[in-house]
Every structure is written in structure tokens, then in C-alpha cells.
Amino acid sequence: MRYTTDIKKSPPQLLKTFAVCDISLYDICDYNVTRDQCKELGCCFYKGVCYKKVVPIYVQMFSTLIVLVTGIIIITIIYRIVQEIKRQMKLSMNSTPKASKKRSAFRPFSRDPSRAPSRSPSRTSSTLSSRSPTTAPTTAPTTDPATDPATDPATDPATDPATDPATDPATAPPTDPSENPP
């Protein structure tokens, strides 16, 4: 039995499977070796010369591009997940009972009809006289005329010039033709 030495090779890499023997691209391994010795060195034998076997540049560029695109996709996914978590936390903080009580307690100019103060007096004379003289009567919050649609002159039909009979030319009293010279 003949004893052969085991040549330990490095584990094959993914790109090494694409390695080719392109003479114009590679360096020379050794000049004076046989084909078998060249293959043991992991090189490529071509026309009596042993060349190094490497991965072409286009394969390296393609693999780099794949790695970059994958990295960008992963970073984008992580960013969106973080933004979604922040948005959910913000919504959950806004919906806490304390925040909702604070929000509903302060509404100085509410347009909600159920909360709007009425224009008629809410207190009768009997409720005002039953108070002690040391307690000052409190007034109901008044609405701002600039924001209240009921007192807005632009929407008030009594002050609208288009419907006001005093300024309407169709209902204006006729003038005497002698007053207007031709």
C-alpha cells in the first residue's frame, strides 16, 4: 500500500464555485509544473503554464450588488418597524384616561351643540336670591363673536346685503326721473 498525503483544502466559498480560468485576468502560479501539480495548487493549467484561478470581476460586482440591495432592504424594514412602534406608542399615550380628561376639560370655544351655552338666561331669580351674599355669582363662558356662527355678520340674514330690503334695488322705492338728469 502506498501512503498518500492528505492535502487539506480550505472550505469552498460560494464565489469560488464561479472561479474560471481566464488567462488574461490572472497571475501565474508556476511555470514548471505538471497539470496534476497545478490542480493540487488550486490553479488552472493552460498551454503549459499554471495560472491562479480566481473569481472574475463581474461575479464579484454582482455579488456586492446583491449584498448592498439586501442590506438596504433590511435597514428599510427595520426603520419602518421602529416608526410603527413609535406611532403606536404615541397613540397609546394620547388615549390614556388622564390625557383624555385634560383634553375634554379645556374647550373654551366648543362648536358641539350639546355643550354650547344657551342664549337664554339659565338662572332664574329664585336661584340668584337663594345664594348667600358672600358668594359671587359666576358667569357662564361666553362665545367669541368672531368664531360664533350665530353672530357672524356674513352668515346673519338680518345683516346680509343681498337679502336686506333696505339695500335691495328691487324693493327700493322708485326715484323720480326728474331727480336724475339725462
Swiss-Prot record:
Entries under Pfam families matching the protein: TEX29 (PF15839)
Subcellular compartments: Membrane
Domain of life per record: Eukaryota
Originating gene: Tex29
Region described as Disordered: 91-182
Biased composition (Pro residues): 171-182
UniProt lineage: Eukaryota, Metazoa, Chordata, Craniata, Vertebrata
Transmembrane segments: 57-77
A GO cellular component entry from the record: membrane
Main localisation: membrane
Membrane topology classification: Single-pass membrane protein
Ranges of biased composition (kind: Low complexity): 115-170
The protein's name: Testis-expressed protein 29
Residue ranges annotated as Cytoplasmic topological domain: 78-182
Keywords per UniProt: Membrane, Transmembrane, Transmembrane helix
Keyword Transmembrane (UniProt): yes
InterPro entries cross-referenced by the UniProt entry: TEX29 (IPR031685)
Organism annotation: Rattus norvegicus
Coiled-coil annotated residue ranges, if any: none
Extracellular side: 1-56
